[in-house]
Amino acid sequence: MNKDALMNAVNLALDGDWDASHKIAQDYSDTSANWIHAVLHKIEGDVWNSKYWYARTAGSRYEDFTDVREELLEIQRILK
């Protein structure tokens, strides 16, 4: 895991740059990157793909957060 890159992905997502954030998340396969990837597909509205990535996290679920901003802030907090 590259914590700096993943933090950058979260910041980009928070700033609304879905594509740039997604490109970073795709480059990593650890549970934090998978969680970011899941949230990005939740933002996109692709429920099936989002749940696919949630299944590859350390226990996070699609239903755990209704507010994606709050979820991204939680990921950011964990990465610090």
Role assignments for model-derived ranges:
Residues 20-23, 27, 56:
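The canonical alpha-helical register within tetratricopeptide repeats
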Residues 29-31, 43-63:
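TPR/TPR-like (Sel1-like) alpha-helical repeat modules
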Residues 35-36, 70:
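Alpha-solenoid helical repeat scaffolds
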Residues 1-5, 29-34:
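Generic helix N-cap/helix-start motif at coil->alpha-helix transitions
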Residues 66-80:
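Terminal, low-structured helical/coil segments at or just beyond the last alpha-helical repeat
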